Amino acid sequence: EQAGVELEIHWHSFELDPEAPPRQEISNSERLAQKYNRTIAEVEDMQRNIAEMAKAEGIEFNWENANSGNTFNAHRIVHLAQSKGLGSEAKEALFYSYMTQGLPIGERETLEDVASRIGLNPVEVDDVLDSDEFADFVKFDEQVAHEQLKVTGVPFFVFDQRVALAGAQPREVFLQVFEQTLNTADQATIEQSTDAPVCNDDQCDVPEK
């Protein structure tokens, strides 16, 4: 609203852990400690910090119950939702299921619940989950991310297919990028700003409190 710009949001797929099982059998703290070679105490401090930042934005992050299972099918459901104009609703519902409810979003029951909450046709949802539908969409997104955009972590944003922004950025930075994008309409190449916390295969940065 401040920038006076009407936005259309399109979500793309990017898996941080493609080999993850549908449900983790160890706690999220244990999993992250193993993945990033940290102590459990360090990981728990990191997650408390994230929870505090989330709370400031009105988001309840119950990190103690989070279960980071495989997200491939969740990405497929998001693509189904986007085909119905419900992409952002699907993402919000998945974030809520994972962050607040502590549900394993790699499991079918959770995905069916999310789909029902946002009004997707249960028959179409079953058709997707019982097949490979939208699998090519997920793989194509990830191929573009890795090979063309050189994405290594999330979050990652692309504006007007020309200006890229990586990491957890304050709203002021987004407004600056909107302005930059509007003022460089004839620019064809993608420029990237990466000076912000990201999560990738090797680390997960969280700003200091």
What annotation goes with each model-predicted range?
Residues 1-98, 204-205:
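Structural alpha/beta surface segment adjacent to cysteine/selenocysteine redox centers
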